[in-house]
Amino acid sequence: MTDSHQVIFYPVNNGDTSQIVLASGRRVLFDFCHRNTSEDSETPEINLNKRLTDELRDAERDYFDVVAFTHADLDHIQGSTDFFELQHAKKYQGDGRIKIQELWVPAAMLLEDADKDHQQEEFVLLRQEARHRLLEGQDILVFSKPQALADWLEPLLLARGEEPSARDHLFIDAGTIVPGFDLEKDRVEFFCHSPFIKHCEEGDIIRNSAALIFNVRFSAGGETYDYLEVGDAECSDLEDIVNITRYHHNGDRLEWNLFNIPHHCSYRALNEEKGERETTPTPPVRDLLLMGRRDAYLVSSSKPIPDVRDSYAQIQPPHIQARNAYERHLKDIGGRKFLVTMEEPNSNKPEPLVFEVSTGGVTKISGAIGGPAIITSNPPRAGLRAR
């Protein structure tokens, strides 16, 4: 098996969808945001439904090995309950729906509340799907096990004649390696940075704080390369990750060749204060940015971020002040480039950003997924990790 993997980011405006395609052919999809407007060829957002369906068809598949929803905000789940087959009800099955072999969700998604007027909201349908799979004991991993979730699950297991601990193997704690992928066999492993149990035990659940965050480590050509897959975290969440990871002597899990930056380039992932021209990261977040390796890439899943006067007054992300901070720190580490999904190759007709992870490093490439990819001349590669 050739050690050549791909990481793809799809241009879905201020939203998230990315995919890992392993050398073995296994596919892991993070989040799903299909914009209905994208079905109009005049809009810049990609028609995600068509794109993913075409990619799977070309690979002779009707499923993803893993679909991970980092959290339940609409810009991370929009259109998912129309696209994917759901096991909990027959009306969400068949008719060309794409299957999910294993669903990854934060515990917070199973604890979401909704009144009777919102039972058909997508986050509720995904909550029902996750609860169904967990209760059936198959095709799911749940990240963290807060007491509120145990209080819901254990009486139901007892009613089925099962032990309260019968689903413990389906819960994954922060600071551990996710089962099902092996660095030696699969050339990849997933280290869970977040969520922590406290994210669901301190009153109201804050989706962004309780979201999935991973260090994804690839093996290629005898070396390893690291990808930080981050949801809509804020600076306090990243500070916790940096401090706790270091405390447990896992500092290498903070290193990165590729970093999907949080929350569509929001300044709040760096500091609670935006700054006039540039956001100043808090010390732990600054440390995380400086853990990037030479020739590394930063990716913002967002609208374009032009450096013009109006951008500096922007209230909602993306924030030019955050971009300026990211680019400054990328320069400090000798990084390669800061890329925005809705800017590449241009803002009128953006295309998926495709990175190849292979012998020598992480390379931004162009070309159709599943077809022959054309590596740019003098390919820019994110450097090696010391072993």
Predicted regions located by residue number:
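Active-site neighborhood of phospho(di)ester-bond hydrolases with catalytic His/Asp-centered motifs
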Residues: 29-33, 63-77, 104-108, 227-236, ...
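Short, solvent-exposed loop/turn and secondary-structure capping segments
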Residues: 18-20, 30-31, 40-42, 78-81, ...
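Active-site metal-binding motif and surrounding structural segment of the metallo-beta-lactamase
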Residues: 42-103, 249-268
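Short, glycine/charged-enriched secondary-structure capping and boundary segments
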Residues: 23-24, 44, 82-84, 118-119, ...
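Flexible, acidic/histidine-containing loops and adjacent segments that form or flank the divalent-metal
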Residues: 1-5, 62, 81-236, 303-387
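Conserved beta-strand hairpin/beta-sheet module of binuclear metal-dependent hydrolase folds
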Residues: 2-62, 210-236
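Active-site-proximal structural scaffolding
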Residues: 13, 41, 76, 96, ...
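Long, structured stretches of catalytic cores involved in phosphate-ester chemistry, encompassing
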Residues: 236-339
